[in-house]
Curated annotation (Swiss-Prot):
Organism: Encephalitozoon cuniculi (strain GB-M1)
Keyword Signal appears in the UniProt entry: yes
Lineage of the organism: Eukaryota, Fungi, Fungi incertae sedis, Microsporidia, Unikaryonidae
Subcellular compartments: Spore wall
Endpoints of the signal sequence: 1-20
Name of the molecule in the record: Spore wall protein ECU02_0150
Superkingdom as given in the UniProt entry: Eukaryota
Residue positions with a glycan: 83
Any single GO BP term: sporulation resulting in formation of a cellular spore
């Protein structure tokens, strides 16, 4: 019979193995109104296309760092299980915005009640410029209103339907990074990198890759 020492070694090996082949799934519901959806379509892209392409690119970058981190035994991939839909709650109107960001905080609380256990991103049809002072005071470059929830392991974000490509991609990337559990804001940046003969290409850069800190280290 195996002794307790060998049993512990076996269990530890099973844990490491499960971490190596498992997936950290982050369920995310993105809400947008018909007017907000039309803003993107008028610019030639659907909101589904934007969220999908950014989520895929962000996953790849995060998982590159997961495998490169020699200090971590948790090699599970991150994966965003995202969905885009219209707002069903009668208490939330994504086409109406208040004088300050307090309205968005209230709506996030309501949305979280309707979608327990899932991170929520609310896309308001208004422009972020009207709230620039609020974000400056909060020390944020990206216009995100954030509600972090412990220990529920889901973080909710309210933001805006910006149609300038780099701006909305930065917004969605940072919002998704927060839904994955990032304790810090503005941790995702887009930059141009030299791609040799092909010229410059746009790439995602992560300013933090210590995923053990995500959601207090207890989620995913």
């Amino acid at each position: 019979m195996f002794g307790s020492k060998y049993l512990l070694i076996l269990l530890a090996g099973l844990v490491i193995c499960s971490q190596a082949i498992g997936i950290r799934r982050i369920p995310v519901e993105v809400y947008v109104s018909e007017a907000g959806r039309k803003k993107f379509l008028d610019k030639g892209r659907s909101i589904e296309d934007i969220v999908g392409s950014v989520a895929e690119e962000l996953e790849l970058k995060m998982n590159e760092h997961v495998y490169a981190d020699r200090a971590s035994t948790d090699k599970r991939k991150f994966h965003f299980d995202w969905n885009v839909s219209g707002m069903t709650s009668s208490e939330i109107d994504l086409d109406k915005c208040g004088k300050d960001t307090n309205r968005f905080q209230y709506d996030l609380v309501q949305a979280a009640r309707d979608k327990a256990g899932v991170s929520v991103i609310l896309l308001y049809t208004c422009e972020s410029e009207g709230y620039s002072e609020d974000f400056i005071l909060a020390g944020q470059k990206t216009p995100l209103v954030i509600q972090r929830k412990y220990p529920e392991c889901s973080n909710d974000v309210a933001t805006f339907t910006e149609t300038e490509p780099m701006k909305i991609e930065s917004i969605i990337a940072n919002a998704l990074f927060i839904t994955a559990g990032s304790p810090l804001n503005d941790m995702v940046e887009f930059e141009e990198v030299d791609n040799g003969r092909d010229g410059f290409k746009r790439d995602i850069r992560l300013k933090t890759t210590d995923f053990s800190l995500f959601s207090g280290g207890v989620c995913h």
